[in-house]
């Protein structure tokens, strides 16, 4: 049967590739799709929705990890601990707004000294003229 295309069973079986690798992501697209379907957020879930959500989550995780790594390096540490994540999130304006109501366990508080409690500068006052 010439001209009928490939016959069944001929050639090597095609290696399956994950949707994460097709999208160039590290986060699991298939697992996120399963969670979206099982969570009953909608009756149906489009094919692009889990890919987009995985990309957004991966970007946020990378952003937080980069800032937390910088905070750890500033403190001369090689391991990221919750304190570094807290410092990274609270020092970034957009992440602080996004995670404003989130409590990070073992994160501590942001260092803050009220201006009234700071020592006064000696050279800042102007000399007064007396006649």
Swiss-Prot record:
Localisation: Nucleus; Chromosome
Segments traversing the membrane: none
Tissue-level expression: Expressed in meristems and dividing cells.
Highest taxon of source: Eukaryota
PTM field: Not ubiquitinated.
UniProt xrefs under SUPFAM superfamilies: Histone-fold
GO cellular component: cytosol; nucleosome; nucleus
GO molecular function, one term: DNA binding
Family: Belongs to the histone H2A family.
Reported function: Core component of nucleosome. Nucleosomes wrap and compact DNA into chromatin, limiting DNA accessibility to the cellular machineries which require DNA as a template. Histones thereby play a central role in transcription regulation, DNA repair, DNA replication and chromosomal stability. DNA accessibility is regulated via a complex set of post-translational modifications of histones, also called histone code, and nucleosome remodeling.
Subunit structure: The nucleosome is a histone octamer containing two molecules each of H2A, H2B, H3 and H4 assembled in one H3-H4 heterotetramer and two H2A-H2B heterodimers. The octamer wraps approximately 147 bp of DNA.
Name by which UniProt lists this protein: Probable histone H2A.3
């Amino acid at each position: 049967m010439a001209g009928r295309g490939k016959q069944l069973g001929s050639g090597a079986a095609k290696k399956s590739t994950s949707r994460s690798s097709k999208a160039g992501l590290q986060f699991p697209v298939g697992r996120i799709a399963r969670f979206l379907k099982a969570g009953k957020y909608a009756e149906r879930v489009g094919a692009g929705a889990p890919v987009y959500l995985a990309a957004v989550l991966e970007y946020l995780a990378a952003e937080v990890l980069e800032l937390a790594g910088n905070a750890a390096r500033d403190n001369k540490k090689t391991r990221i601990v919750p304190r570094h994540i807290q410092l990274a999130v609270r020092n970034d304006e957009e992440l602080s707004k996004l995670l404003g109501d989130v409590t990070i366990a073992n994160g501590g508080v942001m260092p803050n000294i009220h201006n009234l409690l700071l020592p006064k500068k000696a050279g800042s006052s102007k000399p007064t003229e007396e006649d």
